């Protein structure tokens, strides 16, 4: 995985600079989402690794399956095909999104809850977190019954554990000391 990220970084940087310069961060993000899904598909991975397919055939296949691409995006796919880097498209997409979020002042937040959160509770929690981190947040919510109650929030490298399980673990550690 780390090797793929290293390989993907210059491609993500180039795509980001091209998209930012054209004022097309949104369309590029959408195109990379589609292309990453194509590259992650098991049948497409078999095609990518098939030595019988020429670069032109693979390029045509990816562009047809990848949806409506601009000329710059088609050239980007061609560069990836020519350099045998299609397999790192998911990492390119992830790095591109991170660069886009940094540029737009957006942080990724993962909220794990013991129970489903209603819209009002989620909106209030998101507003509190945005005030605390002084940034807009892209929130991903998951359900983790092992938390027993409460929530565990991860924003960047900071984790806020307000779960019953976390509090019990802290109490157990305090009793051992």
UniProtKB/Swiss-Prot annotation:
Q: What is the predominant subcellular site recorded for this chain?
A: membrane
Q: Which Pfam families match?
A: OSCP
Query: Where located?
Result: Cell inner membrane
Q: How does it sit in the membrane?
A: Peripheral membrane protein
| Ion transport as UniProt keyword | yes
Q: Which domain of life is it from?
A: Bacteria
Cell inner membrane as a keyword of this entry, yes or no, is: yes
> Keyword set for this entry?
ATP synthesis, Cell inner membrane, Cell membrane, CF(1), Hydrogen ion transport, Ion transport, Membrane, Transport
Q: Which InterPro entries match?
A: ATP_synth_OSCP/delta_N_sf (IPR026015), ATPase_OSCP/dsu (IPR000711)
One Gene Ontology molecular-function label: proton-transporting ATP synthase activity, rotational mechanism
| GO (cellular component) term, any one | plasma membrane
- HAMAP family (alphabetical): ATP_synth_delta_bact (MF_01416)
Give the protein's biological function: F(1)F(0) ATP synthase produces ATP from ADP in the presence of a proton or sodium gradient. F-type ATPases consist of two structural domains, F(1) containing the extramembraneous catalytic core and F(0) containing the membrane proton channel, linked together by a central stalk and a peripheral stalk. During catalysis, ATP synthesis in the catalytic domain of F(1) is coupled via a rotary mechanism of the central stalk subunits to proton translocation. This protein is part of the stalk that links CF(0) to CF(1). It either transmits conformational changes from CF(0) to CF(1) or is implicated in proton conduction.
PANTHER family found in the cross-reference section: ATP SYNTHASE DELTA CHAIN
Can you state the subunit structure given in the record?
A: F-type ATPases have 2 components, F(1) - the catalytic core - and F(0) - the membrane proton channel. F(1) has five subunits: alpha(3), beta(3), gamma(1), delta(1), epsilon(1). F(0) has three main subunits: a(1), b(2) and c(10-14). The alpha and beta chains form an alternating ring which encloses part of the gamma chain. F(1) is attached to F(0) by a central stalk formed by the gamma and epsilon chains, while a peripheral stalk is formed by the delta and b chains.
As for family, the record states: Belongs to the ATPase delta chain family.
Protein known as: ATP synthase subunit delta
Source organism per entry reads: Azoarcus sp. (strain BH72)
